[in-house]
């Protein structure tokens, strides 16, 4: 059984056919878009609903922009994957892109090492809410 790697553009949808040899855990990870943003090569990324974004801020601050027209129930997860000097050294800015975050009109700064948040879009009045996190309120 041969393996082939194919580069895909950001936000691409993929249909995977398997003869049963791909573990279910691998397919589950592929269901949502997992992307890694490394500050040494990229300092901005625009999320799409369902994204799970690993952010490495070892070199610079990174800005993750939330989807522009979210639907109720859309989720985006952002996590610090820096080996050292993560969000505590160079923060990750979550740009609201026109929607509110926790009912407010300010962007969200993630500035603690090992921080991980899942944001879920609720309503236009409340906007993005923190569904689960180690984010201290």
Which role does the model predict for each range below?
Residues 70, 110-113:
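A short catalytic or substrate-binding loop motif that flags glycine-/basic-rich loops and adjacent residues
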Residues 96-110:
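Terminal beta-strand-rich extracellular "head" domains
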Residues 9-20, 112-123:
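Extracellular disulfide-bonded cysteine-rich modules/repeats
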Residues 78-80, 103-104, 119-120:
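Glycine-rich loops and low-complexity Gly/Arg-rich segments
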Residues 1, 22-96, 124-137:
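Exposed extracellular interaction/assembly regions and N-terminal maturation sites
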């Amino acid at each position: 059984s041969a393996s082939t790697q194919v580069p895909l553009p950001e936000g691409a949808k993929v249909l995977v056919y398997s003869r049963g040899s791909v573990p279910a855990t691998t397919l589950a990870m592929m269901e949502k878009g997992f992307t890694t943003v490394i500050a040494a090569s990229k300092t901005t990324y625009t999320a799409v609903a369902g994204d799970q974004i690993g952010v490495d801020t070892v070199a610079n601050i990174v800005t993750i922009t939330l989807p522009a027209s979210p639907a109720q129930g859309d989720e985006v997860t952002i996590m610090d994957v820096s080996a050292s000097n993560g969000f505590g050294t160079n923060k990750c800015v979550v740009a609201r892109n026109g929607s509110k975050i926790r009912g407010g009109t300010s962007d969200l700064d993630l500035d603690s090492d090992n921080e991980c948040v899942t944001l879920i879009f609720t309503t236009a009045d409340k906007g993005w809410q923190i569904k689960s996190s180690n984010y201290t309120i």
